[in-house]
Swiss-Prot record:
Biased composition (Basic and acidic residues): 477-501
Enzyme type, top EC level: transferase
Native species: Arabidopsis thaliana (Mouse-ear cress)
Protein name (Swiss-Prot/TrEMBL): Mitogen-activated protein kinase 15
Motif placement: TXY: 252-254
SMART domains: S_TKc
Active site positions, chain numbering: D216 (proton acceptor)
Enzyme Commission number: 2.7.11.24
Length: 576
């Protein structure tokens, strides 16, 4: 496998010796591969619910599915998963989600009777960037064991170590997501708001304690059940910071849905990231619970900054200096003075203590936002918050994410994903760590059987079931990208436009000098930083203008790019 293979084999040998019992090993050595950290007793969540008044914290409405018998769907008796002699484990029921990455089916774990979501990720290794994202997420979800983070139950063993293409991940099945809950429940009580925010902050405290930044928190990435249980999902864009690196780190990709993106990230590929970006996103989600609609539904970078300042007021110079994008920073600096709108006027029915906390969460300056732990100590959570139910953890070991620092081949990533899969197959893992080189297996693989089941489900999914299949009712890894329905939201239409312009954005990534020259010609040498000039920014940012026409409204003419592969091209331009 070349240089990458040496890395993988070396880590594998090292892991074997680390797993051998040793009285001299130190549990405080953070450079060792850490075992999954312990969390609070699962019954703590039951105790948490008892702290609320059951008559007030009623069940929420979630979308219900009609689970028809398999025979009525034209599907024969289910073929069951077989893995190393362990037969009849999962019984596939139906397709509940479908996208360009693969298919999600609901299933029954016949060992426990539990309903699960099984995600088939197609052709994982066609693109190294996608495979790396999948590796990153399954690794993070293995390490971040917490009641408020979605759990991977199992990953199916592939039929061949060196040749597998698809990955099957078994998640706990959640009924809906917070986006759908907010849409379907216009009568959420203050107790609901408090309980939802508490769970988000409790989960985020744990994630941040592991030195992980989620970077894409939004209602669609918060799974929900009718009993008001929330879980954070979709860690494909998350990153880990390490003890030997600065607290604020530069990463060269473009993340976070614009409506929930912190102002210091607006319009920039290259940004300083701190835990405060996740706190801002949680604040926007909390505001959406209170309002019943998004707080900052910006159409583009300029509009996003405008509606933020319309509500929060013009930020002070110190806060403006934190904006990474030069044109956005100058645009804010030249903005007319705006006074903040009182939160009680924007949210007239909200609890005053909730608004005081919200004001801290969405402070324009990141240094003014509390940490998740500090937010949990806010008086808003009096009677609910408890250190016993708010577990922390140790920072994730640097060795777990050594692959992020290397240039890996497809075979390298395949081996690393295989290594992650073995975490759910202890006997095979022991053989692997001893240096076993088994390439194929004696028993029929569950993946082979599942491939046939999914294919049959997809073939028998008629047009009438299409809308159901589009609904997101499962964990990520990664999110689906499907054609939008007629009832799609403004945000979804906007994001679809952004995705369709990916190629155009990539083609405009000329050298800075060429871009500046083109901009100077188009602007006629003007030097002002108006909204139009920001739209035509020559900086390496998400505010690239595609096909600008003079009569086009500025709010419709900025298109941002959210594809990680384009960010990589940007980074290569800077390094060349």
């Amino acid at each position: 496998m070349g240089g990458g293979g040496n890395l993988v084999d070396g880590v594998r040998r090292w892991l074997f010796f680390q797993r051998r019992p040793s009285s001299s090993s130190s549990s405080n050595n953070h450079d060792q591969i850490q075992n999954p950290p312990t969390v609070s007793n699962p019954n703590d969540d039951e105790d948490l619910k008892k702290l609320t008044d059951p008559s007030k914290l009623r069940q929420i409405k979630v979308q219900q599915r009609n689970h028809l018998p398999m025979e009525k769907k034209g599907i024969p008796n289910a073929e069951f998963f077989t893995e190393y002699g362990e037969a009849n484990r999962y019984q596939i029921q139906e397709v509940v989600g479908k996208g360009s990455y693969g298919v999600v089916g609901s299933a029954i774990d016949t060992h426990t009777g539990e309903r699960v979501a099984i995600k088939k990720i197609n052709d994982v290794f066609d693109h190294i960037s996608d495979a790396t994202r999948i590796l990153r997420e399954i690794k993070l979800l293995r390490l971040l064991l917490h009641p408020d983070v979605v759990e991977i139950k199992h990953i199916m063993l592939p039929p061949s170590r060196r040749e597998f293409r698809d990955v099957y991940v078994v998640f706990e099945l959640m009924e809906s997501d917070l986006h759908q809950v907010i849409k379907a429940n216009d009568d959420l009580t203050p107790e609901h708001h408090q309980f939802f925010l508490y769970q988000l902050l409790r989960g985020l405290k744990y994630v941040h304690a592991a030195n992980v930044f989620h970077r894409d928190l939004k209602p669609k990435n918060i799974l929900a059940n009718a009993d008001c249980k929330l879980k954070i999902c979709d860690f494909g864009l998350a990153r880990v910071s390490f003890n030997d690196a600065p607290t604020a780190i530069f990463w060269t990709d473009y993340v976070a849905t614009r409506w929930y993106r912190a102002p210091e990230l607006c319009g920039s590929f290259f940004s300083k990231y701190t835990p405060a970006i996740d706190i801002w996103s949680v604040g926007c989600i909390f505001a959406e619970m209170l309002l019943g609609k998004p707080l900052f539904p910006g159409k583009n970078v300029v509009h996003q900054l405008d509606i933020m300042t319309d509500f929060l007021g013009t930020p002070p110079p110190e806060a403006i200096s934190k904006i990474r994008n030069d044109k956005a920073r100058r645009y804010l600096g030249n903005m007319r003075k705006k006074q903040p709108v009182p939160f009680s006027k924007k949210f007239p029915k909200a609890d005053p203590s909730a608004l005081r906390l919200l004001e801290r969460l969405i402070a324009f300056d990141p240094k003014d936002r509390p940490s998740a732990e500090e937010a949990l100590a806010d008086p808003y959570f009096n009677g609910l918050s408890s250190k016993v139910r708010e577990p922390s953890t140790q920072p994730i070991s640097k060795l777990e994410f050594e692959f992020e620092r290397k240039k890996l081949t497809k075979d390298d990533i395949r081996e690393l994903i295989y290594r992650e899969i073995l975490e759910y197959h202890p006997q095979m893992l022991e053989e692997y760590l001893r240096g076993g080189n088994q390439l194929s297996f004696m028993y029929p693989s569950g993946v082979d059987r599942f491939r046939r089941q999914f294919a049959h489900l997809e073939e028998n999914q008629g047009p009438g079931g299409r809308s159901n299949a589009l609904q997101r009712q499962h964990a990520s890894l990664p999110r689906e990208r499907v054609p939008a329905s007629k009832n799609e939201t403004v945000e979804e239409r906007s994001n679809d436009i952004e995705r369709r312009t990916t190629a155009a954005v990539a083609s405009t990534l000329d050298s800075p000098k060429a871009s500046q020259q083109a901009e100077g010609t188009e602007n006629g040498g003007g030097g002002g930083y108006s909204a139009r000039n920001l739209m035509k920014s020559s900086s390496i940012s998400g505010s690239k203008c595609i096909g600008v026409q003079s009569k086009t409204n500025i709010e419709d003419s900025i298109v941002e790019e959210q594809d990680e592969t384009v960010a990589v091209k940007v980074a290569s331009l800077h390094n060349s």
